[in-house]
Swiss-Prot record:
Organism per entry: Streptococcus pneumoniae serotype 4 (strain ATCC BAA-334 / TIGR4)
Protein name: Glycosyltransferase GlyA
Region (GT8 domain): 302-556
Origin: domain of life: Bacteria
Pathway(s) the chain acts in: Protein modification; protein glycosylation
Length: 696
């Protein structure tokens, strides 16, 4: 057991002669012995002082302090002013703690390198003589919070978690958190005022779902006469919380909803208690009116994003939505479709509420569009109906084979002037066909213009005439109608992965990835063996749980550290034109912590594709002419394994050699000399050991 750190236990005392012995007994018998007990007698008029002196003479670890009556907050502050421990905990003098209370919290705060360890509690109702246990014996768990997610749990009523989190007792704090903080004097609900400041100062909080603290409900303590003071006690701490969080730039949606409920409760109880004519009641009524007005204003200011798809694309739709919600708030999604179940829409709306967002069900009958010719899917024509459904003057249309990696406020702030839309140039159209057109996968739509000009009908009319005469379905139609009438956006806002080689594009400063990554072509990242750049980005968003989306509190752009929070995987590249790769299965099986990327400019055989049964193998299939994929493979691989038989891709070997990256080969596979480290085939174990050494 660790005993190096001294832990201070602060006990404020006032007229608790009937309870004090049990409290102090529970502290001096703690299994963790390196404690100091600061007992502050706040002017007691009963025998509490004598009991304190008796215990201080019995246990040298007790520091006994007497002061004139100044209240609970002042007594706790006196304890803080006189503590010498590295950690501090508070125990109210009418309560008691479990024998392993200090030891358990201390072990966890050290194990998790946290700033605060929080336990739960059970209650003893003195009037009833009954214990109330909020946690079942088999429901123990530990959960880590940061200084934002902890606030989301202050409203968690299950297992009385919210009370456990907001109370001063039941926690072990790093003492340094109180260097500039003290309890507010003269305020009801002082625990809440202090803890929300302490949580903001912390970086990590570990919560233990275990009852370690016994909270006594004394006779008469439940009776409350509703007064102006109690109205302020309920609302003011919440008001301060919102102010603190707003100043830190944290999301406020959930906190504002709770604040609104507290105002309603205070006003209802105030009216029932005859306080309707008081200044406090009128003040709270005004706050409620302003809050309702603000809510209506925020509702009208949601940013409109339009998606169009059929239900067979549900995974892709969800991935696109997740990527948007990870970096944005206050979004009104319009899903234009013909076959999404209403239940799916309802369930998704429950998810989106947490992001101050919603999804609008925009159903179009398939007969309206299925008659049109398209080489992709008739759903590409669904964007025609934007003006019929969207109420906002500006809307962002997004294809669902893309992800968003940053906040979109700057894009929405684009001045469209009198243009019907803004879009990114289709650099593939320029390179392959000599056409100066825009790509229709990302469109910032001047919806006020579209409504005024009845663009839905115009698009349908042009499509009726031309849909079977053009080669790119809706994109050709849109470019015909808006020729020379569109505002050009930066390639960053529609980074088509197969077009980067044609665009003069550099990542903007502060971004690890393009703002919007568009996986155009048949090489979709969700398809097996479909090689493309930024494949891991799509899978990152796809794999995010909804509870994880809210963790990007400051709405930062996607960073490589998000995808690889510990470290990027050590990767070996094999670039081959043959499925005969020497000792490949032995290497893959022996080195499960190393990633193997097998790339081929030709279509790989079934034999080689079978290697994807191993979780540390990725196949890059048929990547001829995909220069950016080659560059990504070279950049993200630490070792080149020249272990394939047959034709060599000499430029890849040269790139690794010029970069000074290791190249390992077998003697029977080395046919092009670039300074490889070669092994005999029967020395595969030596190659394995070499790779282990390099990977460290």
């Amino acid at each position: 057991m660790l005993v190096d750190d001294k832990i201070t236990v602060i006990v404020p005392v006032y007229n608790v002669e009937n309870y004090l012995r049990k409290c102090l007994d529970s502290i001096i018998t703690q299994t963790y012995k390196n404690i100091e007990i600061v007992v502050v007698n706040d002017g007691s008029t009963d025998a509490s002082g004598e009991i304190c002196k008796e215990f201080s003479e019995m246990d040298h670890r007790i520091l006994y302090i007497e002061q004139e009556n100044a209240g609970l907050s002042a007594a706790r502050n006196t304890g803080l002013n006189n503590m010498s421990g590295n950690y501090v905990t508070f125990v109210d003098s009418d309560d008691w703690i479990e024998q392993d209370y200090v030891e358990t919290l201390y072990k966890k705060i050290v194990e998790y390198q946290a700033d605060i360890a929080v336990g739960n509690y059970y209650s003893f109702n003195e009037s009833e003589g009954m214990f109330y246990f909020h946690i079942l014996g088999d429901s123990y768990y530990e959960k880590v919070y940061d200084n934002v997610s902890i606030f989301e749990n202050l409203y968690e009523t299950q297992e009385m978690k919210s009370f456990a989190l907001i109370s001063a007792w039941g926690k072990l704090y790093k003492a340094r958190l109180f260097e500039q903080l003290r309890f507010d004097i003269g305020k009801l609900g002082e625990d809440g005022y202090l803890n929300q400041k302490v949580y903001l100062l912390s970086e990590k909080v570990i919560y233990l779902n275990k009852s370690l603290y016994a909270y006594r409900i004394r006779k008469g303590s439940l009776s409350r006469v509703w007064t102006e003071k109690w109205m302020h006690a309920l609302v003011d701490a919440m008001s301060e919380r919102i102010t603190l969080l707003a100043n830190m730039g944290y999301p406020l949606e959930k906190h504002l909803a709770v604040y609104r409920q507290m105002l309603e409760v205070s006003l209802a109880n105030g009216q029932a208690s005859g306080l309707s004519d008081t200044a406090t009641y009128k003040e709270f009524e005004m706050k409620q009116r302003l809050l309702n007005q603000l809510s209506r204003q925020e509702e009208s200011e949601k940013k409109a994003i339009v998606l169009a798809a059929n239900y067979g694309y549900v995974d892709q739709v969800l991935t696109t939505i997740k990527s948007i919600c990870y970096h944005n708030r206050s979004i009104r999604f319009y899903l234009i479709h013909s076959d999404f179940p209403n239940e799916w829409i309802k369930q998704l709306n429950k998810r989106l509420e947490k992001f101050d967002s919603e999804i609008i069900n925009c159903r179009v009958t398939s007969e309206q569009i299925s008659c049109y010719k398209s080489d992709i899917s008739y759903t590409v024509f669904l964007r025609y109906f934007i003006a019929d459904f969207v109420q906002e003057d500006k809307a962002l249309y997004l294809d669902c084979d893309l992800v968003v990696t940053k906040n979109l406020d700057d894009l929405f702030a684009t001045d469209l002037q009198d243009y019907p839309l803004a879009a990114v140039r289709d650099f593939g159209g320029r390179a392959y066909f000599g056409q100066e057109i825009f790509n229709a996968g990302v469109l910032l739509v001047n919806n006020a213009f579209w409504k005024k000009e009845n663009m839905t009908q115009k698009l349908i009319d042009v499509t009726n005439e031309w849909h079977d005469k053009v080669d790119q379905a809706d994109q050709s139609i849109l470019n015909m109608l808006f020729e020379h009438k569109w505002l050009e956006l930066d390639f960053d806002y529609n980074h088509i992965v197969i077009h980067k080689q044609f665009a003069d594009y550099q990542l903007p400063e502060g971004q690890d990835y393009p703002a919007i990554i568009h996986y155009l072509s048949h090489r979709k990242p969700w398809k097996d063996l479909a090689a493309q750049t930024y494949r891991e980005v799509w899978w990152y968003y796809h794999g995010l749980e909804w509870t994880e989306l809210g963790q990007n509190h400051h709405l930062h752009p996607l960073q490589r550290s998000h995808i690889y929070p510990i470290k990027e995987p050590f990767t070996c590249l094999i670039y081959t034109a043959s499925d005969h790769i020497e000792q490949i299965e032995t290497l893959v099986q022996s080195l499960p912590d190393i990633q193997f990327k097998i790339a081929a400019r030709v279509i790989v055989s079934d034999r080689l594709a079978q290697m994807t049964i191993y979780p540390n193998v990725t196949i890059f299939n048929g990547i001829h002419y995909l220069v950016d994929v080659d560059n990504e493979l070279v950049e993200t691989s630490q070792v080149l394994l020249d272990i394939n038989h047959g034709e060599k891709t000499e430029e890849i070997l040269d790139q690794f050699a010029n970069l000074g990256k290791p190249i390992l080969s077998f003697e029977n596979t080395k046919t092009y000399e670039v300074g490889q480290e070669a092994y005999a085939v029967d020395q595969v174990q030596a190659m394995i050991e070499k790779l282990r050494e390099i990977s460290k």
